[in-house]
Amino acid sequence: MKTLLLTLVVVTIVCLDLGYTRKCLNTPLPLIYTTCPIGQDKCVKMTIKKLPSKYDVIRGCIDICPKSSADVEVLCCDTNKCNK
């Protein structure tokens, strides 16, 4: 009986996937990340090209990945902390 109850609990947790949300980096440091709000299930890294200085990088969560342009390179991904 205990085995059946334990099996049901494990199956319930696996099926419900309790508390899962995407985690994305929001700084260049790999240990600092943010938990994305509901609906924002992609991580993004935007590189803004400024001359003559180097690139400014924006990282975080996003719902829809925008297209890259001549001034902004956009990289989107679908796994945790993938926007390095």
Curated annotation (Swiss-Prot):
A Pfam family that the UniProt record links to this protein: Toxin_cobra-type
Localization terms from the record: Secreted
Residue ranges of the TM segments: none
Keyword Disulfide bond: yes
GO CC terms of this entry: extracellular region
Keywords noted in UniProt: Cardiotoxin, Disulfide bond, G-protein coupled receptor impairing toxin, Secreted, Signal, Toxin
GO molecular function: toxin activity
Disulfide bonds: 24-43, 36-61, 65-76, 77-82
Signal peptide: 1-21
Principal location: secreted
Expression (tissue specificity): Expressed by the venom gland.
Function recorded in the entry: Acts as a beta-blocker by binding to beta-1 and beta-2 adrenergic receptors (ADRB1 and ADRB2). It dose-dependently decreases the heart rate (bradycardia), whereas conventional cardiotoxins increases it. At 100 mg/kg, intraperitoneal injection into mice provokes labored breathing, impaired locomotion, lack of response to external stimuli, and death (after 30 minutes).
Extra remark: Negative results: does not affect blood coagulation and does not show significant hemolytic activity.
Family to which this protein belongs: Belongs to the three-finger toxin family. Short-chain subfamily. Aminergic toxin sub-subfamily.
Protein name as annotated: Beta-cardiotoxin CTX27
